Amino acid sequence: MWDGPYGNWGSRKYLLASLDQSLRRMGLDYVDIFYHHRMDPNTPLEETMGALAQAVRSGKALYVGLSNYDGPTLEKATAILDELHVPFIINQNRYSIFDRTIENNGLKAMAARLHKGIITFSPLAQGLLTNRYLQGIPADSRVHTDGRFLKEKDITPEKIAQINALNDIAQARGQTLAEMALAW
C-alpha cells in the first residue's frame, strides 16, 4: 500500500480506503480478518476501532485483528470493540526466540486475560533462525536488497555465535534450527 493523502496508520479514511483497494485487487467481496497493523500515535483509538467496526458491519470483513499493539492499548481497543459489538479475535505479533517483545510489553499476558488469540509473524526471525546465517551473512541475504526488517548492523558476531549455539542445541535434539525455533 502507498501512504496516500491520509498516511498509512490508523485513520478511518486510510483503513477503509486501503480495505476497498485490497478487495478490488484481490477480486473479493470480503476478507475473513481485517487487521490494523500498528498503533497510531496520531489517531484516536476510537476512530481506528470505529473504522474496523464499519468494515465488519459493511460486510467487507468477518472479524477484526490487531497487530503490534502493546498490552494496555490492547485492553482499551478490546473494550471499544466490545462496546461496538464487533468480533475481535486475534493479535498478530512478531515473536521468536530472538524477539520476545510481547512478553515484556504486556501483550501476551493481556491477550491471555482477555481470551484473545495470538498468531506470530517472523517466528524464524527473518531467516536468522535457519541454517542460512550459520557462517555469517550470505551474499544473497535480504539485508543487501531490503533492509527494512533485517539490518546488517544487527547481525553481529555475537548474534552469529547465538545462532550457532542454538543450532547445536537443535542438532542435539535431532532437529534443524528452523524446526526447533518453530516448536519453541
Q: Where do the language-model regions lie?
A:
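Short, acidic/polar
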Residues: 10-26, 74-78
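Active-site mouth loops of central-metabolism enzymes
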Residues: 1-16, 37-43
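Short amphipathic alpha-helical segments at helix-loop
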Residues: 3-7, 33, 147-151
